[in-house]
Amino acid sequence: MLVRNILEESVQKFGEVKAVKWLKKKEISERSYYEIMENAASVRKGLLAEGFEGKHIALIGTSSVEWIESYLGIITGCTTAVPLDAALPCEDLVDLINRSDCAALFLSPKHRPYLEVFLANCPGLQKVWMLQEEVEDVPEKVYSINELRNIGNNASKDAACPDAEDIATIIFTSGTTGKSKGVMLTQKNLASNVEAVKISAEPGTVMLSVLPIHHAFCLVMDWLKGFSQGATLCINDSLLHMVRNMSIFKPDIMLMVPMMIETIYKRLAASDPAIPKQVLAEKVFGGKLHTIFTGGAHLDPYYIEYFAQYGIQILEGYGMSECSPVISNNTPENNKPGSIGKPLENVEVRFENEEIL
């Protein structure tokens, strides 16, 4: 099973289900599984028609429906996606584009000021697609995402399905010494992690995606795992708006790092104790949140017990980008606060001096 197979199966099962929701001018916009995968296929076919088969393609931007459709278009064809941290300084992004040998770039409108710098200092870049419907007054080599989609829609040939050992994505992680390192993950790496995490959700289950989209945890467990279940993924436009967006989208499930959980705890702890917990949960969480998956750092078990008062189960796990990324996790049926759960069925874990290697 490859990522493309998982997504095509999702379209067959959940075609009319709302796959993505986001805020646009204070109104909720949405697209179905059929629409998302149709746009992803247009990107995939467009890249093939433009001669980018086998190339590395960078993406820079915060979470957006255009970003995720482009990412899916890249990894479902014979191309490799290189998602980069949109918060990095321009010179660092130039370095990563060059080090990862990227031939093209998808760029968010917010990063338009970096465009000329990229074109001048990244000699390997052949084309840049802005993640917006139309562009004006742009340099040569720069186009809108719609122009690429139109090329794909008019193309007679689709990209071949990649092989299991083909590199699907390169994730840059913070290096312990010196520069960040690029972790190469294959099609098999991504698909096997999606399948091995035994967490099920009903089609239409609402998930609010709040983690940085260039992280493996967000990409694989929010988006790919969520799509495999027929979930509705809601885009958080800013961490500053997370609590507001929880009340707007009313998620059932969320992925968070411990720092986010601790921030919400402080808000709850500072609330008037006379307010009933059910009322407070409605105000802070939207009233439907029942599960939070967490990883990336240790979480004090106190928070797990505290959130349980509001009917929210926190499931802690452990992983790293090199493992695509989940290694172990607690489940709703087997949740032990203070632990990182059981290893996935396709993972072997070695201990030395009471530490996981």
Question: What are the language-model segments listed below?
Answer:
Residues 191-206, 213-279:
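Conserved AMP-binding/adenylation subdomain of ANL enzymes
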Residues 1, 116, 136-167:
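Flexible, low-complexity linker/hinge segments
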Residues 252-255, 264-335:
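Gly/Ser/Thr-rich phosphate-binding loop
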Residues 20-64, 68, 72, 89-94, ...:
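Conserved AMP-binding/adenylate-forming core of the ANL superfamily
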Residues 6, 76-147:
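Structural core segment of the AMP-binding/adenylate-forming
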Residues 15-18, 130, 150-172, 179, ...:
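Conserved pre-ATP/AMP-binding loop-to-beta segment of ANL
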Residues 58-60, 67, 71, 75-106, ...:
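Short beta-strand->loop structural element characteristic of the AMP-binding/adenylate-forming
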Residues 30-34, 168-194:
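Conserved AMP-binding A3 loop
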